[in-house]
């Protein structure tokens, strides 16, 4: 099939380029996030590995990814392990403070492209930041069973992060949540009170969660969730200790409700991004998206972010 043809073409091209025959190997789940088959070309002046992950259920064949790594030595592209994880003292050195502006720097960029891999791309950035750059978004997508069109459901995001955290013995702590029916009902009450004040349309259906986000008014949400200084302070106080310690915060949002500082390839629906800082003087949140270099460091008003 097309996958096998493409794989053989790549292998033949690498063999012709290097002038040596590859060595085949397998990496188990103990050595990798998912099982992979691989081939390596090692010579005096360089090293290349080619790896694939596939699965089969009955007669159905699923090709997950083909990836290639190249470097000047075999060690430079070797798969790392838990010993390469960064220490708390190391990550705190990435925090930059300028007056009342605090930003975590040096978080590697992973571009999710058009695939809707926001959860795994964002998680891969965190792993790389913590010194675990042997974990990539394609492996994480396979582990979390993330499809190209299934990366934007908020509940699915939480479940996928839980799977990833369990696999790597990483604790995930929820700082703020709208993930259950009680949270939603409380939000709905606050939203309708704010809508009355602003003389805007209320939401009557208590069960249509997705419909609410599709039609929510940004100004009403801001008044409901960030209408008082205490609401803003409470939200900022929850993330401040993590940012000061050099720990980025996962941030699940609904796009299309408040203005964005840059045009996005995704304009509506759920999305996962990173909170990397804040400016207490300007009352802004500093964040990062997994859409390439232009989205490394962006800013929006705290009230918009909380909404």
Annotate the PLM regions.
Residues 194-201, 209-288:
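Active-site-adjacent substructure of cysteine-protease-like catalytic cores
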Residues 9, 13, 117, 121-125, ...:
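Extracytoplasmic/secreted proteins, especially bacterial periplasmic and envelope-associated proteins
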Residues 2-5, 148, 262-267:
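Short consensus segments that form the blades of beta-propeller domains
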Residues 1-34:
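Long, charged/polar, surface-exposed segments that mediate recognition or autoinhibition
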Residues 25-41, 46, 235-238, 294:
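Short aromatic loop motif centered on NTY/YTY
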Residues 56-213:
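Active-site-adjacent structural segments surrounding the nucleophilic cysteine of cysteine proteases
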Residues 56-102, 256-267, 276-307:
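Noncatalytic regulatory segments and standalone regulatory/sensor domains
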Residues 35-38, 45-51, 267-273:
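Short, surface-exposed coil-to-beta transition loops
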């Amino acid at each position: 099939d097309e996958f096998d043809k493409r794989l053989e073409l790549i292998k033949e091209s690498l063999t012709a380029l290097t002038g040596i025959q590859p060595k085949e190997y397998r990496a188990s789940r103990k050595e990798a996030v998912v099982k992979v088959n691989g081939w390596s070309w090692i010579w005096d002046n360089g090293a290349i590995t080619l790896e694939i992950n596939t699965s089969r259920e009955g007669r159905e064949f699923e090709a997950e990814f083909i990836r290639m790594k190249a470097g000047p030595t075999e060690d430079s592209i070797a798969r790392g392990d838990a010993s390469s994880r960064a220490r708390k003292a190391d990550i705190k050195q990435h925090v930059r403070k300028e007056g009342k502006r605090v930003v975590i720097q040096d978080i590697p960029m992973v571009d999710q492209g058009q695939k809707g891999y926001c959860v795994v791309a964002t998680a891969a950035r965190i792993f790389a930041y913590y010194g675990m750059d042997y974990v990539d978004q394609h492996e994480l997508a396979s582990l979390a069973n993330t499809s190209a069109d299934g990366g934007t459901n908020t509940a699915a995001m939480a479940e996928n992060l839980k799977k990833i955290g369990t696999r790597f013995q990483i604790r995930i702590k929820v700082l703020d949540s709208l993930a259950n029916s009680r949270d939603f009902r409380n939000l709905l009450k606050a939203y309708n009170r704010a809508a009355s004040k602003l003389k805007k349309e209320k939401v009557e259906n208590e069960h249509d969660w997705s419909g609410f986000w599709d039609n929510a008014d940004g100004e009403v949400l801001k008044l409901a969730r960030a209408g008082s200084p205490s609401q803003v302070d409470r939200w900022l106080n929850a993330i401040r200790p993590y940012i000061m310690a050099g720990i980025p915060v996962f941030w699940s949002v609904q796009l299309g409700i408040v203005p964005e500082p840059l045009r996005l390839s995704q304009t509506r629906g759920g999305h996962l991004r990173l909170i990397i800082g804040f400016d207490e003087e300007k009352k802004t949140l500093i964040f990062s998206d997994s859409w390439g270099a232009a989205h490394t460091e962006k800013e929006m008003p705290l009230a918009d972010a909380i909404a």
